[in-house]
């Protein structure tokens, strides 16, 4: 009897210690939790606009991923590397950032409306949409043609 209470108490302590750490983040099945947000790599080829629309249809607050820190960039890069299915279109993965016009390097906010607090461009070109590049292990942002279909990562 005393042993059973000890085990139950131990499990309660573990549960309570995980509460509030992000470990209790409720994500949809197949989604991964990181610092209060949920992420999923989709192995579907879509244009930037279609990928963004698809992400908004996943949940009320869904968008293409916005990357706000090096820590989040590393998490997303690892998630993409582990979940992307190899095809000829896996060299790039859409993120939620694009230029408002060709004269601008980028818009002033991510597709979810948040400000750009972290930047990690590999090069500057005149294309409007940004993605992660396989050659950099999905850690650097590259300018891409918005109309090309690539895989993508959603965040809710």
Swiss-Prot record:
UniProt KW keywords: Disulfide bond, Hemostasis impairing toxin, Secreted, Signal, Toxin
Signal peptide feature range: 1-23
A GO CC annotation given for this chain: extracellular region
Disulfide bonding pattern of the chain: 27-38, 55-154, 129-146
A Pfam match: Lectin_C
Expression by tissue: Expressed by the venom gland.
Keyword Signal part of the UniProt annotation: yes
Domain C-type lectin residues, every copy: 34-155
Gene Ontology terms for molecular function: toxin activity
Compartment(s): Secreted
Alphabetical list of InterPro entries matching this protein: C-type_lectin-like, C-type_lectin-like/link_sf, C-type_lectin/snaclec_domain, C-type_lectin_CS, CTDL_fold
Main localization (coarse): secreted
Coiled coil: none
Biological role stated in the UniProt entry: Interferes with one step of hemostasis (modulation of platelet aggregation, or coagulation cascade, for example).
Stated family: Belongs to the snaclec family.
Additional free-text comment from the UniProt record: Shows greater sequence similarity to the alpha than beta subunits compared to other heterodimer snaclecs.
Assembly behavior: Heterodimer; disulfide-linked.
Entry protein name: Snaclec A1
